[in-house]
C-alpha cells in the first residue's frame, strides 16, 4: 500500500489534472464512452441520430418538391417529416434527462474521489504524523506550525503536507508548461542578403 506521503501527493496530482482538463470536458468524454457501451441509452442515442438524419433528408426533399405543382407528394413528405420530428423530440427529451442524471452521478463520483478523499484523509489522519523531523533541526515555533493542528510535535501534519503537495504540484506544472512553451516557440533566424 502507498504511504501517506505518496497517497496525498498523487491525490493532488489527480485534483490538478481534473481542474486543468476541466470538469465539463471530462464529463463529455465519459458520456461519449458511456454511449459506446451496450446499454439502452446508447441504443436511444443511435436511434436519435438516425431520426435526425432522416428528418434532415425529408426536409431537403420537401424543399426540393414544389408545394403547388406536386402537392400530394409534398403533403406526404410533410406528414412523414412531422412524424419523424415528433419521434426525434421524444427521444431527445429522454436522452437529455438521462444525460443530466449521468452528469450528476459523475459529478458526485468525481468530487468524492478527489476533494472528498482529501477531506477524509485530513480527518482520518489528523493525529498521524506524515513524517518526523530530525531533532533540533528547526525552532520550536516552526515545529508547532508544521505539526498544526493535531499531529505530534516534531512532525509534519496531514494538513501542512496537503498544502505543500498542492503548491508543489501547481508550481511544477507551471514550470513544465513554461519550459514547454519556451522550447516550442520557434526562434527567429536572421537572414542577411547581400546588397550591391
Swiss-Prot record:
GO CC field: endoplasmic reticulum membrane; GET complex
User: What keywords does the record list, in alphabetical order?
Assistant: Coiled coil, Endoplasmic reticulum, Membrane, Transmembrane, Transmembrane helix, Transport
A biological process (GO) of this protein is:
tail-anchored membrane protein insertion into ER membrane
Cytoplasmic compartment spans: 25-110, 173-196
Membrane-spanning intervals of the chain: 5-24, 111-131, 156-172
Which cysteines does the record link by disulfide bonds? none
Q: Which Pfam family is one of this chain's hits?
A: CHD5
GO MF term (any one):
protein-membrane adaptor activity
Give the membrane topology: Multi-pass membrane protein
Q: Which residues form the signal peptide?
A: none
* Compartment(s) of residence: Endoplasmic reticulum membrane
Tell whether rRNA processing is among the UniProt keywords.
Answer: no
Give the Lumenal compartment stretches of this protein.
1-4, 132-155
Source superkingdom: Eukaryota
Q: Could you list the residue ranges forming a coiled coil in this record? A: 43-100
**Function description:** Required for the post-translational delivery of tail-anchored (TA) proteins to the endoplasmic reticulum. Acts as a membrane receptor for soluble get3, which recognizes and selectively binds the transmembrane domain of TA proteins in the cytosol.
- Recorded family membership: Belongs to the WRB/GET1 family.
Q: Which PANTHER family match?
A: GUIDED ENTRY OF TAIL-ANCHORED PROTEINS FACTOR 1, TAIL-ANCHORED PROTEIN INSERTION RECEPTOR WRB
Quaternary structure, per UniProt, is: Interacts with get3.
What's the protein here called?
A: Protein get1
Species, as recorded: Aspergillus oryzae (strain ATCC 42149 / RIB 40)
- The gene it comes from is get1
Amino acid at each position: 500500500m502507498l504511504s501517506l506521503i505518496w497517497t496525498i501527493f498523487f491525490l493532488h496530482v489527480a485534483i490538478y489534472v481534473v481542474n486543468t482538463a476541466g470538469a465539463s470536458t471530462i464529463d463529455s468524454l465519459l458520456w461519449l464512452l458511456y454511449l459506446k457501451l451496450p446499454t439502452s441509452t446508447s441504443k436511444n442515442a443511435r436511434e436519435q441520430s438516425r431520426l435526425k438524419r432522416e428528418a434532415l433528408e425529408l426536409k431537403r426533399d420537401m424543399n426540393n418538391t414544389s408545394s403547388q405543382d406536386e402537392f400530394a407528394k409534398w403533403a406526404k413528405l410533410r406528414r412523414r417529416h412531422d412524424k419523424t420530428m415528433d419521434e426525434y423530440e421524444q427521444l431527445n427529451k429522454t436522452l437529455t434527462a438521462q444525460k443530466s442524471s449521468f452528469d450528476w452521478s459523475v459529478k458526485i463520483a468525481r468530487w468524492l474521489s478527489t476533494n472528498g478523499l482529501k477531506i477524509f484523509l485530513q480527518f482520518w489522519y489528523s493525529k498521524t504524523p506524515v513524517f518526523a523531523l530530525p531533532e533540533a533541526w528547526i525552532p520550536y515555533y516552526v515545529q508547532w506550525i508544521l505539526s498544526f493542528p493535531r499531529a505530534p510535535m516534531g512532525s509534519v501534519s496531514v494538513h501542512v503536507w496537503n498544502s505543500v503537495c498542492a503548491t508543489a504540484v501547481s508550481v511544477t506544472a507551471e514550470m513544465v508548461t513554461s519550459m514547454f512553451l519556451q522550447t516550442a516557440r520557434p526562434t527567429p533566424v536572421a537572414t542577411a542578403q547581400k546588397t550591391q
